């Protein structure tokens, strides 16, 4: 989720390659999420599950446009492809990069995917995925996610003379609770998603959740589903608050890590400067391609030590203020902010830059380099109720570089409402997924996620101290 050195040239090359070599992917129309949706003739509806490890397409309900005898439905006869679709030559659709999906079952159903043993125009295809499967997500997963970065799906059965690819919609009951919008601020658009609980007489708090580096762009559903942030609207978390809680999920156009500081080439420096992360996996390929065209310089360490204030600080604050004006039932003394990875950095950044505004913070696997935090900034943070969450196995945001020394300094400044949940690792809690079956001593060892994914625990309301979960604790905090 994070970058190895700031190296803006590297980022420039990645973005350049993306736009030069990969034309704009787009569906025929912009897709939103519904609680339920019925496909019309020759249409399909995608059912997306918000897993701890990310979104997955678990089933597709499609309308054959004719009655289909269940005796003629054989799973082996169906071919289902996940496709990237792009606009080419003035809106002529071209299908590109097909993934052949493994179908576990196809059957006749009602319009909502419930199995029936009689002829129907509706059929349902089921899929099964292992955690973190690259074929599971409905999103194309580009570095900067565009509003249309959703896969198309194509269902083919030559025996039944079927070919269906027109998408009627996508279904996820939690995502359907959220509305999406955009705010033009500082000359560009900032997308966001938000949820308001059913209206009650009392004022309610606001939870602001900030995504990581992989969920930036202009598709707020990626910020919602990419790391299961939709769970903030679940009954389990909403019931921690007497009146429920409003939820605001802003989406950075690029990443919260962009700072106000410019390098010698006039490009914004990213914070932190010397960390490892997923972009390095792309940079080698990008350089090898472009080296045949232009001269690509080697990495050079960044010499600017204090690139730390996010370029999006004021834009995010503008969005928060506008949202508060539009929702006067929100209690301004109970505004909570949290986020993971780059969003954890941005959480601390906002608490420092806007002292006294927020009631509490929950920075998770945060990447604000401790050595960049001045004593004055630590003093500001020490006055804010904080609950840090991290895993010992986090190699991307090593506790020794980030949360551990910061936490100790906060203790030294007398922070009175300070908490840290440090997990041994990040393990599946659902009981559905297990490690490789090569451990004879513990064959039921749960699946272990990357140690950076400690947001899984937070968004499942798992961290607990003195009998209170993290969101129960949050509900008690006031400015």
Where do the model's predicted regions map?
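Bacterial N-terminal signal peptides
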Residues: 14-23
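A domain-start/cap signature at the N-terminus of enzymes
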Residues: 27-61, 82-204
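Short beta-strand element of the alpha/beta-hydrolase
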Residues: 202-215
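The conserved beta1-alpha1 loop
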Residues: 210-212, 365, 390-391
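Active-site machinery of serine-nucleophile hydrolases
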Residues: 213-314
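Short, proline-enriched alpha-helix->beta-strand connector loops that line the catalytic pocket
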Residues: 243, 380-386
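Primarily recognizes the serine-hydrolase "nucleophile elbow" in alpha/beta-hydrolase
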Residues: 324-380
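C-terminal catalytic histidine-bearing segment of alpha/beta-hydrolase fold enzymes
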Residues: 387-395, 401-479
